[in-house]
């Protein structure tokens, strides 16, 4: 079959936007479905806006009809014809009331039989879909996500441009500096044995831009981190990156709140109430057992240490004596939902997180308590009262150090919330998490390590603790959390040269290391720096939530898989020996 050309024709309308008025149109797209009914043929033509039905009648134009008989699924077509009402209306389609009676059909490209049905691929193996990603990207669901992501990027630029931000590009090849994850390294051909690093973030460059006087910076920045993947993480991602001078934390948060309000109203029609609620890190952990709390439902953690301190139960007593606590969550209706076997699974899950075990009170017809023999008169009633329990509830209790108890109950809270169906769909609960810990304790190496990049400003009232009490140092850093997912992180930056030196020293860096890794930035601060701070918002993750997608793969055109490879192009791959020689690189074989 000889293929046609577009000569003499140009598209007048997208398929999903063909008007209902009678007029001549030219549409282009992929053949979605072909129905041959003898003397009639109907072809659903698909493009990124939707479908339109093409109609062919052998009595009207035999030549065009015969060409339509050649069409198969996924052929690329161009069709000219008159819009007319359909005999049978399809209410599911935007163009379901009309069809195009075709007078000129062009077959521009043929398709072999596809390895899966493009528009019905939900049950198709993910590996197969990723291998043929260009076909899966034709799926209307996936196209809708990609187009929504485009709209998010468009609104993002509009908002920040309107608020005086300058979009400035920062280098993609930079010096390797410690930022938490492993760098992707790029060997230099010109400088043998030396490497560039792909940016984990534009952090250093955007701070230099503030020192340079560009007081409002924005960039949709590509970032790279060589770390293990999960459902909400990719080795390369896009960050809505911003920095502001002559501001404080509240100014930056107010700017972001305005952006969130505009974005959710324009994309989803959702009204976001401002200002967004705030929780300190300590309060978030105490109430929800997480620094990324899902606040769409209750089931908050209750501290019952004082209530149970006199109960002669060694699990409780040893935890309290060791400076820990006894805390609980009340799973409303959980006694009815959870069987004893399912409760045992919760216990095992708690152990998997790090807890030694889990006590419980299952109040069905009668209270069934896992530590009943240790209870004195009135103890059970006191516990029930402390957590607001009533008949039908399940109380889960954990006793240990707070760093074990809180994340354990926080994880169980989410599991039980999903199991009971109490987490509302279609609800968007934002919360700022503030006053983040400045240091984290590394049990393995028995030392305090930085919880943030080394340019994060400590809170003024905590400066005296830097040398004496690292556990009490809080940072001028914050996260924006939506429905239990961290959307963004931000902080105020250190602008005092001496404090920055002290911070490097607190992180165990020698003068030589400081000079080698950050010498150019330290030098820049010698020439004065305005007060500044900024944030990074994950565009991929934001898109995933707005699109209600299950994975970042559903909002990224060409994603990587769990082992950081791309199945479609089979990368990473080996390269020619000549290329390696030019880069002064030799490879060694690794036994698998």
Model segments located where?
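Class II aminoacyl-tRNA synthetase catalytic cores and aaRS-like
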Residues: 1-592
């Amino acid at each position: 079959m000889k293929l046609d050309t577009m000569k003499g024709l140009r598209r007048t309308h997208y398929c999903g936007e063909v008007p209902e008025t009678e007029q001549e149109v030219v549409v282009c797209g992929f053949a979605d479905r072909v129905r041959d009914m003898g003397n009639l043929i109907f072809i659903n033509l698909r493009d990124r806006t939707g479908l339109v039905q093409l109609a062919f009648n052998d009595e009207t134009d035999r030549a065009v009809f015969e060409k339509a008989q050649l069409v198969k699924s996924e052929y690329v077509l161009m069709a000219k014809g008159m819009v007319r009402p359909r005999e049978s209306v399809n209410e599911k389609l935007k163009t379901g009331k009309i069809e195009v009676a075709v007078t000129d059909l062009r077959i521009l490209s043929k398709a072999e039989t596809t390895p899966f049905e493009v528009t019905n691929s939900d049950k198709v193996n993910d590996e197969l879909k990723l291998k043929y990603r260009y076909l899966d990207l034709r799926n209307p669901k996936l196209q809708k996500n990609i187009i929504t992501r485009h709209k998010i990027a468009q609104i993002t630029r509009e908002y920040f441009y309107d608020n005086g931000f300058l979009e400035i590009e920062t280098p993609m090849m930079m010096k390797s500096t410690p930022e938490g994850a492993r760098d992707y390294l790029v060997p230099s051909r010109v400088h043998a044995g030396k490497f560039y690093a792909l940016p984990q973030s534009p952090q250093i460059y955007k701070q230099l831009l503030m020192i340079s006087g560009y007081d409002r910076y924005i960039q949709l920045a590509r970032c790279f981190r060589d770390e293990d993947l999960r459902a909400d993480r990719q080795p390369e991602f896009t960050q809505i990156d911003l920095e502001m001078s002559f501001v404080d934390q509240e100014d930056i948060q107010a700017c972001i709140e305005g952006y969130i309000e505009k974005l959710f109203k324009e994309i989803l029609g959702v009204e976001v109430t401002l200002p967004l609620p705030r929780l300190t890190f300590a309060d978030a952990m105490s109430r929800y057992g997480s620094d990324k709390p899902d606040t769409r439902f209750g089931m908050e953690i209750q501290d019952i240490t004082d209530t149970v301190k006199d109960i002669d139960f060694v699990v409780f007593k040893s935890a309290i004596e060791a400076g820990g606590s006894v805390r609980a969550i009340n799973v409303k209706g959980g006694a009815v939902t959870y069987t004893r076997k399912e409760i045992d699974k919760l216990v095992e899950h708690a152990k998997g997180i790090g807890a030694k075990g889990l006590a419980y009170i299952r109040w069905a017809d009668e209270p069934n308590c896992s530590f009943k023999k240790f209870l004195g008169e009135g103890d059970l009633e006191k516990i029930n009262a402390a957590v607001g329990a009533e008949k039908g509830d399940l109380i889960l209790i954990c006793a240990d150090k707070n760093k074990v108890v809180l994340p354990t109950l926080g994880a169980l809270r989410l599991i039980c919330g999903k199991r009971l169906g109490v987490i509302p769909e279609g609800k968007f609960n934002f919360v700022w998490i503030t006053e983040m810990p400045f240091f984290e304790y590394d049990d393995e190496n028995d030392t305090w390590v930085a919880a943030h990049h080394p340019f994060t400003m400590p809170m003024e009232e905590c400066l005296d603790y830097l040398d004496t009490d690292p556990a009490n140092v809080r940072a001028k850093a914050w996260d924006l959390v939506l429905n239990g997912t961290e959307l963004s992180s931000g902080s105020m930056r250190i602008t005092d040269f001496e404090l920055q030196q002290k911070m490097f020293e607190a992180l165990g860096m020698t003068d030589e290391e400081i000079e080698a890794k950050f010498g150019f930035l330290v030098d820049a601060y010698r020439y004065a720096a305005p007060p500044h701070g900024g944030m990074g918002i994950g565009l991929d993750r934001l898109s995933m939530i707005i699109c209600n997608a299950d994975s970042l793969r559903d909002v990224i055109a060409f994603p990587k898989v769990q082992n950081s490879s791309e199945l479609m192009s089979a990368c990473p791959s080996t390269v020619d020996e000549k290329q390696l020689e030019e880069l002064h690189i030799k490879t060694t074989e690794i036994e698998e």
